[in-house]
Amino acid sequence: MARLNRESVIDAALELLNETGIDGLTTRKLAQKLGIEQPTLYWHVKNKRALLDALAVEILARHHDYSLPAAGESWQSFLRNNAMSFRRALLRYRDGAKVHLGTRPDEKQYDTVETQLRFMTENGFSLRDGLYAISAVSHFTLGAVLEQQEHTAALTDRPAAPDENLPPLLREALQIMDSDDGEQAFLHGLESLIRGFEVQLTALLQIVGGDKLIIPFC
C-alpha cells in the first residue's frame, strides 16, 4: 500500500466525493477506501467537518486560478474573473458548493484575502464596502452553483411537468432555462451585481468630490 499522508487522504476523499456526494462522504467510508482502520485516519483528519474544510481549501488551491487581480486590472474585471474562476472550481466536483458552505479563510489563504481587500480599498472602496462587495459576489456564486448542482441531482428523481399543463410564459421561461447550462444566468446576475456596485461607488465619489471613498454605502 502506498504511504499514507495528508495528500493521499485528500485525493481519496475527493474521489469519494465524486462517487457518493457529500452525504455519502464519511470518515468510515474514506478509511475503507484507503484500506485502513478508522482510528488511523484521525491522525490526518479529526472528523467530517475538518475533512470538508480541508477539501474546500484543496479544491480552490487546485482549480481556482484567478484569486488575485492582474497588474492594472479594474476592480470590475477582477470581481468578474474571480467569480468565474470560483464557479469553475466548485463545479469540478459533485456537491462542490456544499463542501464550501460555511467555511472561512484558511491560514494558507490569508495573504490572498489581504491582497484582495487592499486592491478594493486602493480602487476607492472603504474596507467595509470592499469586503461586502467581495462577499456578495462570493455568496452569489456559491448560491448559483449550489442551485445548479441540486437541480442536476434532482433531474433523475423528479418527473418533468407536462408542457400542456404550463402557462405560456412559464413554458417559454423553462425553455430558456433548459437551454442554459447555468452559465448565462450566472453571468447575467454577476453583471447586475457589479453594475450596482459601480452606481453606488460613483455616486459616493461624487459626493466627496472625487477623493478616496471613506464612507460606507449604507
Curated annotation (Swiss-Prot):
Give residues annotated as binding Mg(2+): 100
**Record's Gene3D superfamilies?**
Homeodomain-like, Tetracycline Repressor, domain 2
A biological process (GO) annotation for this entry?
negative regulation of DNA-templated transcription
Q: Does the keyword Transmembrane helix apply?
A: no
- The answer to keyword Transcription applying to this record is yes
Tell me which PROSITE patterns the record gives.
HTH_TETR_1, HTH_TETR_2
Q: What factors induce this protein?
A: By the [Mg-tetracycline]+ complex.
Which keywords appear in this protein's UniProt record, sorted alphabetically? Antibiotic resistance, DNA-binding, Magnesium, Metal-binding, Plasmid, Repressor, Transcription, Transcription regulation
Q: Name one Pfam family in it.
A: TetR_N
UniProt DNA-binding residue ranges:
26-45
Q: Where does tetracycline bind?
A: 64, 82
Q: Which SUPFAM superfamilies match?
A: Homeodomain-like (SSF46689), Tetracyclin repressor-like, C-terminal domain (SSF48498)
Specify the HTH tetR-type domain's residue ranges: 3-63
Single GO molecular-function term? transcription cis-regulatory region binding
Q: What is this protein's function?
A: TetR is the repressor of the tetracycline resistance element; its N-terminal region forms a helix-turn-helix structure and binds DNA. Binding of tetracycline to TetR reduces the repressor affinity for the tetracycline resistance gene (tetA) promoter operator sites.
Complex formation: Homodimer.
**Record-linked NCBIfam families:** PRK13756.1
What is the official name of this protein in its record? Tetracycline repressor protein class D
Q: Which gene encodes it?
A: tetR
